[in-house]
Regions:
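A polyanion-binding, active-site-adjacent surface
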Residues: 1-157, 165-168, 191-194
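Short, conserved loop/helix-junction motifs that constitute active-site signature segments
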Residues: 150-155, 173-179
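Short, flexible loop segments at boundaries between secondary-structure elements
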Residues: 175-211
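Short, glycine/charged-enriched secondary-structure capping and boundary segments
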Residues: 43-46, 103-105, 173-177, 199-201
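Solvent-exposed amphipathic alpha-helical surface segments
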Residues: 61-65, 173, 213
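Intrinsically disordered, charged low-complexity linkers and terminal tails
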Residues: 154, 208, 212-216
Protein backbone atom coordinates (compact mmCIF):
# COMPACT_ATOMS: atom_id res chain seq x y z
CA UNK A 1 0.00 0.00 0.00
CA UNK A 2 2.91 2.37 0.71
CA UNK A 3 4.12 1.95 -2.87
CA UNK A 4 0.62 2.69 -4.21
CA UNK A 5 0.38 5.86 -2.11
CA UNK A 6 3.81 7.02 -3.25
CA UNK A 7 2.70 6.45 -6.85
CA UNK A 8 -0.35 8.68 -6.28
CA UNK A 9 1.82 11.36 -4.67
CA UNK A 10 4.26 11.28 -7.57
CA UNK A 11 1.44 11.50 -10.11
CA UNK A 12 -0.13 14.50 -8.33
CA UNK A 13 3.32 16.07 -7.96
CA UNK A 14 3.49 16.55 -11.73
CA UNK A 15 0.79 19.22 -11.40
CA UNK A 16 0.69 20.31 -7.77
CA UNK A 17 4.20 20.15 -6.32
CA UNK A 18 6.04 22.99 -4.54
CA UNK A 19 9.68 22.18 -3.91
CA UNK A 20 11.85 23.40 -1.00
CA UNK A 21 14.00 26.50 -1.47
CA UNK A 22 17.24 25.95 0.41
CA UNK A 23 20.21 28.12 -0.60
CA UNK A 24 23.64 26.52 -0.21
CA UNK A 25 24.37 29.11 2.48
CA UNK A 26 21.13 28.53 4.41
CA UNK A 27 21.72 28.16 8.14
CA UNK A 28 18.14 28.70 9.34
CA UNK A 29 15.43 26.53 7.78
CA UNK A 30 11.72 26.76 8.42
CA UNK A 31 9.60 23.62 8.01
CA UNK A 32 5.88 23.98 7.33
CA UNK A 33 3.07 21.50 6.71
CA UNK A 34 2.27 21.69 3.00
CA UNK A 35 1.59 24.13 0.17
CA UNK A 36 -1.83 25.62 -0.53
CA UNK A 37 -3.33 27.74 -3.31
CA UNK A 38 -0.95 30.73 -3.12
CA UNK A 39 2.05 28.44 -2.81
CA UNK A 40 1.02 26.59 -5.97
CA UNK A 41 0.50 29.90 -7.77
CA UNK A 42 3.98 31.21 -6.90
CA UNK A 43 5.86 27.87 -6.76
CA UNK A 44 7.27 28.70 -3.34
CA UNK A 45 6.57 27.56 0.23
CA UNK A 46 4.78 30.04 2.55
CA UNK A 47 3.81 32.37 -0.29
CA UNK A 48 0.47 33.45 1.20
CA UNK A 49 -0.74 35.28 4.30
CA UNK A 50 1.26 33.03 6.65
CA UNK A 51 4.39 33.99 4.76
CA UNK A 52 3.60 37.68 5.22
CA UNK A 53 3.32 37.15 8.96
CA UNK A 54 6.67 35.36 9.00
CA UNK A 55 8.44 38.06 6.99
CA UNK A 56 7.02 40.93 9.06
CA UNK A 57 7.94 39.31 12.37
CA UNK A 58 11.38 38.07 11.38
CA UNK A 59 12.48 41.18 9.50
CA UNK A 60 10.84 43.41 12.14
CA UNK A 61 9.10 45.58 9.57
CA UNK A 62 5.92 45.70 7.53
CA UNK A 63 6.47 43.89 4.24
CA UNK A 64 4.31 43.58 1.15
CA UNK A 65 5.57 40.15 0.10
CA UNK A 66 5.48 36.81 1.96
CA UNK A 67 8.71 35.18 3.10
CA UNK A 68 8.51 32.43 0.50
CA UNK A 69 8.31 34.90 -2.36
CA UNK A 70 11.18 36.99 -0.94
CA UNK A 71 13.40 33.91 -0.65
CA UNK A 72 12.42 32.69 -4.13
CA UNK A 73 13.02 36.07 -5.82
CA UNK A 74 16.35 36.41 -4.06
CA UNK A 75 17.41 33.01 -5.39
CA UNK A 76 16.28 33.88 -8.92
CA UNK A 77 18.25 37.15 -8.75
CA UNK A 78 21.49 35.34 -7.92
CA UNK A 79 21.39 35.59 -4.12
CA UNK A 80 22.18 39.31 -3.64
CA UNK A 81 20.63 39.57 -0.15
CA UNK A 82 22.93 38.20 2.56
CA UNK A 83 20.10 37.75 5.04
CA UNK A 84 17.73 35.91 2.69
CA UNK A 85 20.65 33.78 1.48
CA UNK A 86 20.74 32.13 4.89
CA UNK A 87 17.04 31.25 5.06
CA UNK A 88 15.69 27.91 3.86
CA UNK A 89 12.00 27.05 3.55
CA UNK A 90 10.42 23.66 3.01
CA UNK A 91 7.21 21.74 3.60
CA UNK A 92 6.86 18.26 5.04
CA UNK A 93 4.79 17.47 1.95
CA UNK A 94 5.51 18.97 -1.47
CA UNK A 95 1.86 18.50 -2.46
CA UNK A 96 -1.11 20.13 -0.69
CA UNK A 97 -2.80 18.17 2.07
CA UNK A 98 -6.11 20.01 1.63
CA UNK A 99 -8.24 18.96 -1.31
CA UNK A 100 -9.47 22.52 -1.86
CA UNK A 101 -6.14 23.15 -3.61
CA UNK A 102 -6.89 20.49 -6.25
CA UNK A 103 -9.07 20.35 -9.33
CA UNK A 104 -12.33 18.53 -8.68
CA UNK A 105 -11.55 15.82 -11.23
CA UNK A 106 -8.27 14.93 -9.50
CA UNK A 107 -10.07 14.73 -6.16
CA UNK A 108 -12.78 12.45 -7.56
CA UNK A 109 -10.19 10.13 -9.07
CA UNK A 110 -8.42 9.77 -5.70
CA UNK A 111 -11.19 10.26 -3.13
CA UNK A 112 -9.94 7.61 -0.71
CA UNK A 113 -6.43 9.10 -0.81
CA UNK A 114 -7.72 12.60 -0.07
CA UNK A 115 -9.87 11.33 2.79
CA UNK A 116 -6.74 9.82 4.33
CA UNK A 117 -4.81 13.07 3.80
CA UNK A 118 -7.45 15.07 5.65
CA UNK A 119 -7.51 12.64 8.56
CA UNK A 120 -3.73 12.58 8.97
CA UNK A 121 -3.52 16.37 8.68
CA UNK A 122 -5.95 16.87 11.56
CA UNK A 123 -4.68 14.19 13.97
CA UNK A 124 -1.24 15.55 14.77
CA UNK A 125 -1.23 14.09 18.26
CA UNK A 126 -1.06 10.52 16.92
CA UNK A 127 1.88 8.63 15.47
CA UNK A 128 0.19 5.22 15.17
CA UNK A 129 -3.27 4.74 13.70
CA UNK A 130 -5.88 2.00 13.94
CA UNK A 131 -6.47 2.29 10.19
CA UNK A 132 -3.57 0.54 8.38
CA UNK A 133 -3.83 2.79 5.33
CA UNK A 134 -3.20 5.86 7.50
CA UNK A 135 0.00 4.32 8.80
CA UNK A 136 0.98 3.62 5.20
CA UNK A 137 0.27 7.23 4.21
CA UNK A 138 2.30 8.51 7.14
CA UNK A 139 5.19 6.25 6.10
CA UNK A 140 5.00 7.53 2.51
CA UNK A 141 4.94 11.19 3.61
CA UNK A 142 7.83 10.54 5.96
CA UNK A 143 9.91 8.95 3.19
CA UNK A 144 9.42 12.06 1.04
CA UNK A 145 10.19 14.38 3.95
CA UNK A 146 13.39 12.50 4.75
CA UNK A 147 14.57 13.33 1.23
CA UNK A 148 14.22 17.04 2.06
CA UNK A 149 16.21 16.70 5.27
CA UNK A 150 18.97 14.83 3.46
CA UNK A 151 19.58 18.01 1.44
CA UNK A 152 20.78 19.83 4.56
CA UNK A 153 22.49 16.96 6.33
CA UNK A 154 26.05 17.91 7.19
CA UNK A 155 25.27 21.61 7.61
CA UNK A 156 25.38 23.54 10.85
CA UNK A 157 21.91 25.03 10.98
CA UNK A 158 18.80 25.71 13.02
CA UNK A 159 15.61 23.91 12.01
CA UNK A 160 12.27 25.43 12.96
CA UNK A 161 9.29 23.11 12.42
CA UNK A 162 6.26 25.42 12.57
CA UNK A 163 3.10 23.87 13.95
CA UNK A 164 2.23 20.45 15.31
CA UNK A 165 2.20 18.63 11.98
CA UNK A 166 5.74 19.68 11.06
CA UNK A 167 6.99 19.04 14.60
CA UNK A 168 5.51 15.55 14.56
CA UNK A 169 7.29 14.63 11.33
CA UNK A 170 10.62 16.07 12.48
CA UNK A 171 10.37 13.86 15.57
CA UNK A 172 9.45 10.82 13.46
CA UNK A 173 12.25 11.34 10.97
CA UNK A 174 15.27 9.06 11.08
CA UNK A 175 17.40 11.72 9.37
CA UNK A 176 19.33 13.48 12.11
CA UNK A 177 22.52 15.49 12.46
CA UNK A 178 24.49 16.56 15.52
CA UNK A 179 25.08 19.90 13.80
CA UNK A 180 21.38 20.72 13.84
CA UNK A 181 19.69 22.83 16.49
CA UNK A 182 15.97 22.08 16.38
CA UNK A 183 13.63 24.68 17.85
CA UNK A 184 10.34 23.04 18.80
CA UNK A 185 6.99 24.54 19.89
CA UNK A 186 6.95 27.38 17.37
CA UNK A 187 3.32 27.71 16.19
CA UNK A 188 2.29 27.66 12.57
CA UNK A 189 2.13 31.30 11.38
CA UNK A 190 -1.43 30.98 10.06
CA UNK A 191 -4.14 33.31 11.38
CA UNK A 192 -1.46 35.81 12.44
CA UNK A 193 -0.57 33.51 15.36
CA UNK A 194 2.98 34.85 15.63
CA UNK A 195 1.55 38.16 16.83
CA UNK A 196 -0.77 36.63 19.42
CA UNK A 197 -0.11 37.23 23.12
CA UNK A 198 -0.11 33.56 24.09
CA UNK A 199 2.86 32.87 21.80
CA UNK A 200 4.80 36.01 22.68
CA UNK A 201 7.58 34.31 24.67
CA UNK A 202 8.21 31.64 22.03
CA UNK A 203 8.24 34.12 19.16
CA UNK A 204 10.60 36.38 21.12
CA UNK A 205 12.94 33.40 21.52
CA UNK A 206 12.63 32.66 17.80
CA UNK A 207 13.45 36.25 16.84
CA UNK A 208 16.42 36.34 19.19
CA UNK A 209 17.84 33.12 17.75
CA UNK A 210 17.12 34.31 14.23
CA UNK A 211 18.94 37.62 14.71
CA UNK A 212 21.90 35.89 16.36
CA UNK A 213 22.30 33.50 13.43
CA UNK A 214 21.03 35.37 10.39
CA UNK A 215 21.17 39.14 10.45
CA UNK A 216 24.49 40.32 9.02
Amino acid sequence: MVEKIIAIIEQLSKKYSVKPIIPDTASFSFILESPHIQELKHSAPVAGSSGKTMASVLLDQTVEKPLGLLVKENAEAGFPDRTLNRIGIMNVSNIPLQKKAYDLLDVKQNEFFFDLLEKIRTTNERTVYSIPEMNDLQTALLQKFNEHLMQIRGRTCTLVPCGRFAQKFVRLSTVTDDNWNIMYDVPHPSYNSWNQTRYRDKISELKRTFFENIIV
